[in-house]
Amino acid sequence: MRRLRLRALTICTLVALAAPAGAAEITRVATSETGNLFDFHVSLRWDRTQLRGKLTREQGDPAANPPFGANVDVDELRYTRITNALVPRFAIGLHRDLEVHVELPYVLADDHSWRFALVNGLPVEAVSTITNNTIDAMNQPCDPGGATCPLFPVGSNTTVYHGGRAGDVKAGVAWGIFSDARDDTKPFWLVGADLTFPTASAYDPAAGRSASWASPHVSSGNPGAFGEKVWKYDLYTVLSRRLGPIDPYFKAHVTGMQRSSGTYSNCEHAAELARRAPAEATLAGAANCSSWGDDARARLPWIGGLTFGAELVPYENPSEDQKVSVDVRAFADYTSSQRFYNPLTDMSGKLHATEPYLTMGGLFGLYLRASRFVSLHASASLATQTAHFLSGESLGRGGVADAGKDITGVTANPDLNPNYDWRYDAPGRRFRFSETSVFGLSVAGVLQF
């Protein structure tokens, strides 16, 4: 039996070594050339992503660093976000190794859940700074008698539901500048550019909140929108070189974002939120929205990343256009600082200042090409993010506000940041995201004509 397995492996390896080099899936591009004037690829992909992590919050501890005391991170919440989407993709070859493509995603669900963290097997509800909060956004007591006013509701598994809507349309172009199949002295070099249009319905995290600050979308029968209403520009390049049964590759990409006319801002509801009891925004900040202009609006991140990997080809039959390949890769993405949606948004109803962080992970993929016309793709990935703050706005322009004026936000102060909330942004009250895991699954069927 062992000899048979060894012979089979040897035959597959020899076939792969003898076969013409075929491009790795990461560099696959629709083409148009002599003998194949029209290349049309249609695929339907299911993507599932699960993000999990722990939210901690700074708290003053007089016993730490005596006699001065210090801020320590205390466990508050466990957070989960699960996204499921169907993504039809269409690609047309215009010229040799030159394609245009479009993706039309439909988000089945994008649900955010949280519950109290456990310490020594018990929920932290009784000692939670979320439950026992006593101040409003202007650092004023919620109640003269000292009654608490929780920041937001936390149940056994509070969930805010999103989805059941079309996502942002993505369109782009990809060009294989060099091809190792045509010239074995060169690698396959692919460059591409994608544009994501802000077509998904905008999500307003503060709209429709109850007296307890619960989201109107805590019912699965009333899922909310999820659109960010930003333009996204993605540039990427991939290099790959087939070496017998192994096809190593390298990818680099950068993504930039630009606000649209529909991009959400905390200033949209600042005036009405400042008049709530307890106040959810500062009175001075609401008055400053106009004078601060773009400085008060969403501040979008940019993302840059590298991927290193290889496809292993245990079987390939060029005459029948059949191929089995295994994809193994490692990747890392840097996400810059921002004031945008983050895991705290569905709870707080706000955009928050988020620290930069690094996402690192790996992917395992299996690709089965049954014929020239049909192939199946499946992959699983696991990643983690470096710990980062989810809140921490600067008090004023350049990080400071005029100390000679009221910095609470109760009375006028043109230097006060309209986004500043004493409950979330003051040192000693900031939230932090850690112990994260990002698990992804993707399955796709591809038809090629």
Show the residue positions of the predicted features.
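Transmembrane beta-strands of outer-membrane beta-barrel pores
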Residues: L44-R52, L104-D110, D168, I177, ...
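Transmembrane beta-strands of outer-membrane beta-barrel proteins
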Residues: F38-L44, V100-V102, A171, P187-A193, ...
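Structural signature of outer-membrane beta-barrel channels/translocons
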Residues: A91-D97, P105, A174-D180, V238-G244, ...
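Outer membrane beta-barrel transmembrane domains
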Residues: V127-T131, S261-F449
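Outer-membrane pore/translocation modules
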Residues: D111-R299, P418-R429
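Short loop/turn motifs that connect adjacent beta-strands in outer-membrane beta-barrel proteins
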Residues: A24-F38, D97, S113, F178-W189, ...
